[in-house]
């Protein structure tokens, strides 16, 4: 018959559990009086990593891992088959190689920041009674006194019956993340996170850097092909097929980021988020509609360029939910 576990065994087991909970926290526990990231998974749809430093959304379709693979795979192929030859060529293409690696690293960092950072999550009201007062079902309309081009425009405050809070203007509730987000633009399945006030700039940087990385990859491989063909090397010889593959890969892959980047530049120039734009056109197909400046938009106070800078460079603001606090 086995005896009771010793004190050292109990301490070792508890330390192991704490380490795994620090490494990845999937299911929270409201009874644990430790840090917020150990409790929040039970109230939201988040998974926390490394003691609440990184976070992701629970999903059965991890498209963000596919995007991560699409980012890493061309860099590996380029490093193995192309970089060495271009670096040591007598024509001096070292600058293009360095620029590609810089754009690729920028793209990977921006993707990571977009996917794992806080988009502007608002804390829930956990002290509210389950029965919502009847007056909370009414929206509150306030005058917007900025004196902009929108004239006597107004902003609407809505009560979130899930989070039990009054949402600030431009904030919306995400049904995937199960939380309200400041200046909520949309929930992006490709980064598995919401795009909001605190990570919108990272999202735009990801689109821009991905476009630049694809363009530089095409330039590097095209120069290799051009030089090889002029020197009489057949394309069937190694490693030229890899250069052709990377050119086609980058050309196809850059289409979506270019379209999204142009779309968000137009949206930010008119001071609209994706949710506001879709609501203004009745949630119809946005491809069939031209992005126009809305006259009733209280936030479009300046010209196109100033509006774009105001939305893209909007202050991130302090984090409403610090996941590492007790």
From Swiss-Prot:
InterPro entries: Palmitoyltrfase_DHHC (IPR001594), PFA4/ZDH16/20/ERF2-like (IPR039859). GO terms for molecular function: protein-cysteine S-palmitoyltransferase activity. GO terms for cellular component: endoplasmic reticulum membrane; Golgi apparatus. GO terms for biological process: protein targeting to membrane. It comes from the Eukaryota. Keywords: Acyltransferase, Endoplasmic reticulum, Lipoprotein, Membrane, Palmitate, Transferase, Transmembrane, Transmembrane helix. Coiled coil: none annotated. PROSITE patterns: DHHC. It catalyses: L-cysteinyl-[protein] + hexadecanoyl-CoA = S-hexadecanoyl-L-cysteinyl-[protein] + CoA. Residues 1-62, 112-202, 263-326 are cytoplasmic. Residues 158-208 form the DHHC domain. Its EC number is 2.3.1.225. It is found in: Endoplasmic reticulum membrane. The chain crosses the membrane at residues 63-83, 91-111, 203-223, 242-262. Residues 84-90, 224-241 are lumenal. The DHHC domain is required for palmitoyltransferase activity. Interacts with ERF4. Belongs to the DHHC palmitoyltransferase family. ERF2/ZDHHC9 subfamily. This is Palmitoyltransferase ERF2. It comes from Candida glabrata (strain ATCC 2001 / BCRC 20586 / JCM 3761 / NBRC 0622 / NRRL Y-65 / CBS 138) (Yeast). The lineage of its organism: Eukaryota, Fungi, Dikarya, Ascomycota, Saccharomycotina.
